[in-house]
Structures are given as C-alpha cells and as structure tokens.
Amino acid sequence: MEAFAYVLILTLAVVTLFFAVAFRDPPKFDRK
C-alpha cells in the first residue's frame, strides 16, 4: 500500500507543478 501512496503523491506533485508552470507561463510550442 505504501508504494501506491508514493505513486499517488508523486503524480499529484507532478500535475501541480505542470499546471503551475502552464498557467504562469503560457505554452510556447503554439507560436514557433
């Protein structure tokens, strides 16, 4: 069960970081 908890926390952290960067700095792949 601990492995599942670790994966869940890591996934939540990665998603939070991704959204924070995406909302703070708009994606640049749209306009090359």
Swiss-Prot record:
Q: Which is a GO BP term held by this UniProt record?
A: photosynthesis
Lipid bilayer topology: Single-pass membrane protein
Residue ranges crossing the lipid bilayer per the database entry: 3-23
Q: Which SUPFAM superfamilies match?
A: Photosystem II reaction center protein T, PsbT (SSF161029)
Question: Does the keyword Transmembrane helix belong to this entry?
Answer: yes
What are the entry keywords? Answer: Membrane, Photosynthesis, Photosystem II, Thylakoid, Transmembrane, Transmembrane helix
| Source taxon at top rank | Bacteria
* A GO term from the CC aspect: photosystem II reaction center
Q: Name the Pfam families on file.
A: PsbT (PF01405)
Q: Could you tell me where this protein is found in the cell?
A: Cellular thylakoid membrane
Primary role: Found at the monomer-monomer interface of the photosystem II (PS II) dimer, plays a role in assembly and dimerization of PSII. PSII is a light-driven water plastoquinone oxidoreductase, using light energy to abstract electrons from H(2)O, generating a proton gradient subsequently used for ATP formation.
Concerning its family, UniProt says: Belongs to the PsbT family.
Quaternary structure, from the entry: PSII is composed of 1 copy each of membrane proteins PsbA, PsbB, PsbC, PsbD, PsbE, PsbF, PsbH, PsbI, PsbJ, PsbK, PsbL, PsbM, PsbT, PsbX, PsbY, Psb30/Ycf12, peripheral proteins PsbO, CyanoQ (PsbQ), PsbU, PsbV and a large number of cofactors. It forms dimeric complexes.
What protein name does the entry list? Photosystem II reaction center protein T
Biological source species: Prochlorococcus marinus (strain MIT 9301)
* Gene (name only): psbT
